[in-house]
């Protein structure tokens, strides 16, 4: 897999973006600049509530957005701009819960199309693979993942390769027995860490990244702790 020339190219460029606080700082900078404010004098916690509702379904909204960005700055900004667009169209003074929900759904659909193409470019056998996850549970065990992959027409050694791709692109994470969910960007894009962590936990399951769940109609499970 590592011999594929383009594999993970974009993720490796963004390796430094693994800290939510760094992304939040970037968002503060972009917002301040867009509002013609002095970034050095802007406190995120003071500015954000003026632009967006503070919580969505009990979760702080900037954290909610960042958790669905795959830790990519441009994705974080896409979500915000989608939500802002819905708020503007409805003449809302700030982004409300319904605007954020619609924004995340629009972003999720864009991301689904984008990542499906990206996967197909580096692994042609994976064409349309993400669409086979439509209406599936948030958590899937090894047997369920293999069944979905086979349904997509992938078999043999390609099954393991494809699952590796899904992990590396952040589409799937690994949930261990302690309920923590680990995605590739939380282990500095070291696939070995995810695979060894899974191998050590007999009861591990794969977890769909929340970024894709709205577009795929994923059935949500109890709230997970994401690392």
Description of each model-found segment:
Residues 29, 33, 82-85, 89, ...:
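Short, well-ordered loop/turn and helix-capping segments at boundaries between secondary-structure elements
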Residues 58, 67-157:
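Winged-helix-like regulatory helical subdomains adjacent to P-loop NTPase cores
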Residues 88, 147-152, 161, 183-194:
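C-terminal/domain-terminus segments
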Residues 176-182:
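Short, Lys/Arg-rich nucleic-acid/phosphate-binding segment
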Residues 152-169, 174:
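Short amphipathic alpha-helical interaction segments
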Residues 1-58:
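The catalytic "switch" region of P-loop NTPases
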Residues 186-227:
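Short, amphipathic alpha-helical interaction segments positioned at domain boundaries
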């Amino acid at each position: 897999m590592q011999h594929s020339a383009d594999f993970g190219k974009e993720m490796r460029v963004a390796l430094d973006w693994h800290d939510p606080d760094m992304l939040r700082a970037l968002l503060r900078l972009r917002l301040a600049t867009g509002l013609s404010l002095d970034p050095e004098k802007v406190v995120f916690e003071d500015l954000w509530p003026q632009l967006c509702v503070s919580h969505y379904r009990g979760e702080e909204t900037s954290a909610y957005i960042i958790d669905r960005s795959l830790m990519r700055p441009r994705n974080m900004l896409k979500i915000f701009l989608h939500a802002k667009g819905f708020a503007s169209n409805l003449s809302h003074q700030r982004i409300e819960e319904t605007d954020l929900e619609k924004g995340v759904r629009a972003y999720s659909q864009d991301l689904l199309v984008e990542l499906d193409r990206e996967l197909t470019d580096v692994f042609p056998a994976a064409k349309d693979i993400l669409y086979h996850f439509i209406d599936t549970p948030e958590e899937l065990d090894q047997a369920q993942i293999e069944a979905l992959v086979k349904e997509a027409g992938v078999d043999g050694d390609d099954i393991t390769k494809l699952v590796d791709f899904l992990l590396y692109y952040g589409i799937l994470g690994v949930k261990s027995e302690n309920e923590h969910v680990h995605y590739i960007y939380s282990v500095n894009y070291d696939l070995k860490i995810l695979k060894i962590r899974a191998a050590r936990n007999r009861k591990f399951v794969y977890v769909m990244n929340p970024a894709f769940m709205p577009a795929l109609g994923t059935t949500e499970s109890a709230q997970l702790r994401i690392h």
